[in-house]
């Protein structure tokens, strides 16, 4: 993390190359059928969000998604529209300095993959990584967003906090 910036043209290219549409189903957008090991906390030591010459004052932002069956409509909205809108708004309003986003997917306690976390990114890679997440699409009422909080508290190294 720490290099590049996000642009509307990057989003347009990604959306076109993946044929993304808000009329698609969760399974059409999130095509993985198992958790990618690079997003599985079991295989992640630390996620870093460091300042760089290009981004000297990074502001970490985590977008957490409930990936249980009942929330599929929201994941589609985030993947096809809302993430792009959020990032464009952050850049156009300069609401925060040097935004670096991480996407996280959390499900039920008993899921195969109750938590997945991307890298912190400041460019189109965040949208690409979001689309690589596994949407488990189950649900038994034991959603665990607290596993995300635990991960963030123990497995991140963030300059904005360390300063």
What are these regions (language model features)?
Residues 1, 84-87, 155:
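N-terminal leader/presequence segments that precede the conserved core
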Residues 2-62, 69-76, 88-89:
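Acidic, polar low-complexity linker/tail segments
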Residues 54-117, 122-162:
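Von Willebrand factor
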Residues 45-52, 113-129:
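Short, Lys/Arg-enriched charge-dense amphipathic segments
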Residues 44, 50-55, 92-95, 154-162:
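Surface-exposed acidic, glycine-flexible loop patches that form ligand/cofactor-binding
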